[in-house]
Amino acid sequence: LNTTALSGASLGQVYLATRNGQQVIVKVKRPGIEKVVEKDLKVLMKIIPFAMKFVDPNLRFSIIPIMKQFVESMHEELDYTKESDNLKTIKKNMEPYDNVVIPNVHDDYSTKNILTMEYIPGIKVTDIQSLDEKGIDRQQLVIDVHKVFFTMLLKHSIFHADPHPGNISVKDDGTLILYDFGMIGRINDETRIKLVRLYLGLIEKNPPRTVNAMDELGMLA
């Protein structure tokens, strides 16, 4: 295990290690982080009623559901077995698509506090110079990123909900690599159909259809 962290975040750190001659990624949760998070969440929940006074009245109704979702997401992120399950589910869902790869999990070296995964190196999606040096079509890359995430969102019941540049890399052949499945989202069929209507309205530049879809989603309440 290389004790110098490759990257770090508020909940844990990521290290590079070797197992049976192959490089792996080891994600380690920070000691005692559960108590810190629970304390912070309690403080946050106490602040919300006061903060609501300064929020637009039209937006107040959405604050509590958003906070409940945030608390649930934080608890999931603290349990690496749940992240492992999320990764495996999304990996299986995306297997038919050859423009994206997701690391395998090493179950025998993973626990609630440690997650060991296959190491798949790649180029950051924001590293324009390296992408150009490899001859990767950046316009096609943007299309592929949209396709991958919209496929998860509109076709499957679970999707990667943290698509920032640090969680998306590119192989030399242009294949996308997705990392970090601690934050995921779930969507039911009813909401998915409403989202499809919204996107169709936007694509067709049809204001009435778009507004109707937004109303169905509760975006105009």
Q: What name fits each language-model region?
A:
Residues L1-A221:
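Conserved catalytic cores of large enzyme domains
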